[in-house]
């Protein structure tokens, strides 16, 4: 594998994660999918390695990792389990990035300090029954009452919603202002009036709990608002820009994992008296799978280098390109992996059908790939 612009600390981190994955993640990857089980035992392991709190700066007790580090971690873990990869850097979207970019110093010291301990899980609550890509149409309301805000409404498909300690909730705080009337709040899930529903029955990422969540007069201190009132859409877009490359990293890892097992299988599977790897048709499939995945990887780490150097001009479009291209690649590569396995690929005895089921979500969450193409086209046309 090309080492791109990786520095020594990136390579050391990658090697450490690779060893951890072999020891702790690979042995349970199929089981957590089969049993629809959240791998709670990985929380402590990831936390002790600093993988939950990667983006917490050193001044607040964290590793102070950059985007390249986060993506390397996700790529390595996703080679065997996307569910486990989604747990890594769990706090980034729900707590660390919003507070780093928009929080007060008091919020940073409190919440980043908690995250740095490596035991805090978070979630983000944006999507509602009538609100997916159109964030501006959300119905969840927050009404100010003295020194508090009172939340009412509900969200759906909330990743880690049943296990999170804190949830970043987006709610409308003023009427008639479109996206500008939305604010963001950190909600402690122990707060009275907060509840979650039955876990969603999903095609893939079955080791990750997704649930609907509900707010029934949930009272949140005013100091838990992140950023200026009514400006959370800007917060959301900024965080999504930084998070989308991590989806690309997960997709690249998933694709590479599918390639690795397909290559090994093609060497071992015999038909017509020889390994199927000797047939040109299989060789062409494997070559295309690796070319596409390597192209996605090159795009990914070019994007992370931009972020690490704080080169923000054009970054939003590049992040959308990475997310879109890598997830489309993972979907195609994992489908081809199933085809190489033939009938065996359709069976749960082999991981490629799980890889294919897991791959689909990357084309949907963090903004659908249709939305990504809109972002890219608008950048091309309007700059």
Show the residue positions of the predicted features.
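Alpha-helical interface subdomain recognition
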Residues: 1-80, 84-90, 102-107, 114-119, ...
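Short Gly/Pro-enriched turn/cap motifs at secondary-structure boundaries
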Residues: 115, 130-133, 157-160, 173-176, ...
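Short Ser/Thr-interspersed hydrophobic loop/turn segments at strand-loop and sheet-helix junctions
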Residues: 50, 74-78, 171, 187-192, ...
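Helix-loop "lid/cap" segments that line or gate small-molecule binding pockets
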Residues: 93-101
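Long, acidic (Asp/Glu-rich), low-complexity accessory segments flanking structured domains
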Residues: 217-235
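A short, Trp-centered hydrophobic/proline-enriched beta-strand micro-motif
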Residues: 118-126
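A short core secondary-structure module
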Residues: 148, 152-196
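Flexible, small-/acidic-enriched active-site or ligand-binding loops
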Residues: 137, 190-221
